[in-house]
């Protein structure tokens, strides 16, 4: 049997970047996830930092993490950032908090993760995610 294959020279498109959204307030998490999906991102959701660690340990592909700072569980957002620096040093994280100055100070001390102050608009979030992602893919 002689089958003819139609092979294209066009590059295979890359999958959209995957954002792990870590937020304990389900309504906030749902809105963020929906906006990011509409903006062309794949999204994985976690209700707290402990759940985020389990997602990452399961081997689910994640390109960047967007996490609230104040959450219940054994880790908060800063603890998650420290865990990522230790266990997944190439994985970017952006933190968000309503207490911006205190969060920035703590971030500088423990994880050096950028902080997006609440309230933020979705366009700013998308821009920051894309900027951090392009930083990792630039030569």
Regions found by a protein language model. Give the residues of each.
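Acidic catalytic/metal-coordinating carboxylates
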Residues: 48, 75-80
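Active-site residues of response regulator receiver
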Residues: 68-69
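Non-catalytic signal-transmission and effector/linker regions of two-component phosphorelay proteins
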Residues: 1-20, 26, 33, 51, ...
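Short acidic/polar segment at the start of the alpha1 helix of CheY-like receiver
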Residues: 25-29, 72
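Charged docking surfaces used in two-component/phosphorelay signaling
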Residues: 30-38
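Acidic, metal-coordinating helix/loop segments flanking the phosphotransfer/catalytic sites
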Residues: 45-64, 104-105
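Negatively charged, flexible loop motifs adjacent to catalytic sites
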Residues: 99-103
């Amino acid at each position: 049997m002689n089958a003819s294959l139609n092979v294209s020279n066009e590059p295979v498109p890359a999958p959209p970047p995957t954002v792990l959204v870590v937020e304990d307030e389900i309504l906030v998490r749902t809105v963020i996830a929906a906006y990011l999906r509409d903006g062309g991102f794949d999204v994985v959701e976690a209700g707290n930092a402990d759940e985020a660690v389990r997602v990452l340990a399961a081997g689910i592909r994640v390109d960047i993490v967007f996490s609230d700072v104040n959450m219940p569980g054994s880790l908060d957002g800063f603890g998650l950032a420290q865990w990522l620096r230790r266990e997944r040093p190439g994985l970017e994280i952006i933190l968000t908090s309503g207490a911006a100055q205190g969060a920035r100070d703590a971030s500088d001390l423990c994880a050096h993760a950028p902080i997006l102050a609440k309230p933020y608009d979705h366009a700013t979030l998308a821009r920051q995610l894309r900027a951090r992602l392009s930083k990792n893919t630039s030569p």
